[in-house]
């Protein structure tokens, strides 16, 4: 923008740097609006960008109007649709992805986990350092990690061996220098192996073609028109992709030949064989063999998590369906998440390097803030597990338990008919030959939400809570996070002998998939019957 243009717009627009706009709007709304929040709006065309002498400015009124709509109109719209008030303080809607996945919380993706800030919110208000908390539906260990950060002792139970592996890697103590040395050596060996597979000229030419189309057809102006609903995304993208595929087809004919060199790798593992290209299967298999050769069992588990996380990111699928796989995609596609042409990953190297360094960094960061507290991870069925017997294997923790028993529960049971918890990590179970216990899941998606499924769900959750009560002290506080759209929890609490103290209704704004309908979850605060 030249000086004349600047003079023309200055009287009409109040332009500020993103940093200045963040400070002004935070003060105005009494709610922290960070620089990255405004940068996101600029990046995705929600507000205009003004560039003057290589500095980015925004119109403060435009940004303010966006947040007014977000804070007030959206709240009103959601509450009208749902028919009741929501606890917006629990939305944590302006947290960045980095904050929602701080330190070891971000070591491995896990669909259906709550954010650590939600756990922290309730632990700070209802529990003390030295207390013992139990999570009978541990998942990836969010509650246990947050307890460790706050000096609270914790116990987690999960039916899935892989979930227990994720949690264990988050909570273990490490020799950081040894960890770095072994993991970086494994990374470098994999790089050398991949390099010897040969350069892929096809990928280079494909990327050039994608870049050409994105620069011409999926510009910032296109994103702005989308946000203002001035263009039909489906029809426009379909038309452009038809043109793209004509050129792409010629590239494939020129460069791609039938190459069955790696065709037999993972042929006996149906998920891996279906969702990964031959080259990627070869790279995954090479790193897997390095894991098998690793003699340090603690670090071996970290390497397993790095490979699993890498495998998840290099599946042949679209960015907007990463959480719920539909059909394999190995060619470029229009991406509804990024509003441009994207392509599936062609090699594991970029992700493997990124995740190796990221996991090391997260573990090192957590090692500096973790407190001195006990934790216990139990791979078992929460309906029947004897926590006392498990604690006896850890004498110091058991002595603490004997003197006070368990002070509370903070957990999020499976949501009826929404997630298949084993299937979401099918790649990991096959990679590491981990036994699957799908039939022992409570309320999985594959069983649906029929009357029969609801009855089984009520019995399953009730059995867990009844079993847990045996190990709680009489003043224990219980918090359960769930989306109770079938209104099953009143009966569950009656069966379990629990009294509802309060229900919080938390709006969930940052969802993985394209569904943007109003969605909330309940946080039930409970106590035991006297």
Swiss-Prot record:
Q: Which GO terms describe its molecular function?
A: DNA binding; methyltransferase activity; N-methyltransferase activity; site-specific DNA-methyltransferase (cytosine-N4-specific) activity
**Coiled-coil segments:** none
Listed GO CC annotations: cytoplasm
A UniProt-annotated Pfam family: N6_N4_Mtase
Source organism's superkingdom? Archaea
Q: Does the keyword Ubl conjugation apply?
A: no
Q: What is this protein called?
A: Type II methyltransferase M.MjaII
């Amino acid at each position: 923008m030249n000086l004349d243009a600047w003079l023309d717009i200055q009287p009409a627009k109040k332009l500020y740097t993103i940093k200045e706009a963040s400070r002004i709007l935070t003060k105005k709304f009494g709610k922290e609006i960070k620089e990255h929040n405004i940068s996101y709006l600029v990046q995705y065309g929600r507000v205009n960008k003004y560039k003057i002498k290589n500095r980015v400015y925004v119109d403060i009124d435009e940004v303010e109007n966006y947040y007014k709509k977000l804070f007030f109109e959206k709240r009103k719209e959601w509450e009208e649709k749902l028919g009741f008030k929501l606890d917006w303080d629990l939305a944590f809607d302006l947290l960045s992805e980095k904050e929602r996945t701080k330190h070891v919380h971000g070591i491995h993706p896990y669909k259906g986990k709550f954010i650590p800030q939600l756990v922290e919110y309730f632990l700070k208000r209802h529990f003390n350092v030295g207390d013992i908390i139990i999570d009978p539906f541990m998942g990836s260990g969010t509650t246990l990690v947050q307890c460790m950060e706050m000096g609270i002792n914790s116990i987690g139970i999960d039916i899935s061996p892989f979930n227990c592996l994720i949690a264990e890697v988050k909570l273990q103590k490490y020799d950081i220098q040894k960890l770095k040395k072994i993991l970086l050596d494994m990374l470098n060996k994999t790089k050398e192996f991949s390099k010897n597979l040969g350069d892929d000229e096809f990928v280079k030419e494909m990327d050039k073609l994608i870049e050409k189309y994105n620069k011409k057809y999926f510009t910032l102006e296109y994103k702005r028109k989308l946000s203002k609903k001035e263009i039909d995304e489906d029809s426009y993208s379909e038309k452009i992709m038809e043109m793209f595929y004509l050129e792409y087809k010629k590239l494939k004919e020129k460069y791609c030949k039938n190459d069955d060199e790696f065709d037999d790798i993972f042929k006996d593992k149906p998920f891996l064989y279906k969702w990964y290209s031959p080259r990627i299967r070869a790279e995954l298999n090479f790193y897997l063999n390095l894991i098998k050769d690793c003699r340090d069992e603690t670090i071996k588990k970290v390497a397993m998590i790095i490979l699993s996380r890498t495998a998840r990111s290099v599946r042949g699928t679209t960015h907007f369906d990463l959480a719920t796989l539909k059909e394999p995609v190995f060619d470029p596609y229009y991406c509804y998440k990024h509003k441009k042409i994207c392509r599936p990953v062609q090699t594991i190297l970029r992700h493997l390097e990124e995740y190796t360094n990221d996991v090391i960094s997260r573990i090192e960061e957590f090692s500096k803030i973790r407190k001195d507290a006990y934790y216990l991870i139990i791979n078992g069925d929460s309906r029947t597990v004897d926590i006392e017997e498990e604690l006896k294997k850890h004498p110091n923790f058991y002595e603490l338990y004997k003197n006070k028993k368990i002070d509370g529960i903070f957990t999020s049971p499976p949501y009826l008919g929404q997630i298949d918890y084993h299937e979401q990590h099918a790649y990991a179970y096959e990679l590491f030959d981990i036994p699957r216990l799908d039939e022992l899941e409570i309320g999985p998606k594959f069983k649906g939400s029929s009357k029969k499924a609801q009855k089984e769900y009520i019995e399953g959750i009730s059995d867990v809570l009844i079993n847990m009560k045996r190990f709680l002290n009489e003043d224990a506080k219980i918090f359960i996070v769930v989306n109770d759209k079938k209104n099953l929890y009143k009966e569950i609490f009656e069966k379990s002998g629990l009294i509802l103290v309060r229900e919080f209704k938390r709006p969930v704004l940052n969802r993985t998939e394209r569904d943007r309908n109003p969605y909330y979850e309940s946080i039930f605060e409970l106590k035991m019957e006297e």
